[in-house]
């Protein structure tokens, strides 16, 4: 058996359950500790999945932890990732990497300087459908592609998330940061980097029941 990485999970909210359930199918890493600014959330995860709960700072400085799984709210991604890297740990974050391009570039520079890996959701472009599309493009089955689009509609994060408030923040909130990465990642993977960016928007109702 190859190396098993010891992982510390930060952010014991809604998405953490998905990672805890999925990680049992992999034999190259193990979540051994968890942390959250809400200590009760961390204790609940620790009890459910039979691991240790510690404070966020303790986890980030823990020499046993090799990889930090960053599942905090978007506005906290940059700070947790930066502290993790500076403490010599590889990082995998939920999307987005950061809420500004400047902060994202800084994280990449730190990772390169420290010779660490930093990864980020979504990894959905590695799924069967996207990879088949990539194969067809590589084989030029459909000729040269000139245009691609992604369409998404749903009633809002408040329709399923138990704590949707952070996703309505003026900075670090909204559908572009929440759902946009899935479509942008797929399009960039299939068509290459964007040369220009523009947008249109629709003014939505000012009030929404949460």
Region spans (language model):
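Short, Asp-centered acidic motifs that coordinate Mg2+ and/or phosphate
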Residues: 33, 66-67, 147
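N-terminal Rossmann-like dinucleotide-binding module
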Residues: 1-49
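Predominantly a Rossmann-like dinucleotide-binding segment in NAD(P)-dependent oxidoreductases
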Residues: 124-202
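Single conserved hydrophobic/aromatic residue that forms the stacking wall/gate
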Residues: 201-210
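Aromatic/hydrophobic pocket-lining residues that form π-stacking "cages" and hydrophobic walls in ligand
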Residues: 42, 80, 107, 133, ...
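Beta-loop-alpha module in the N-terminal Rossmann-like domain of NAD(P)-dependent dehydrogenases
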Residues: 19, 51-110
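Rossmann-fold dehydrogenase core element
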Residues: 106-123, 144-147
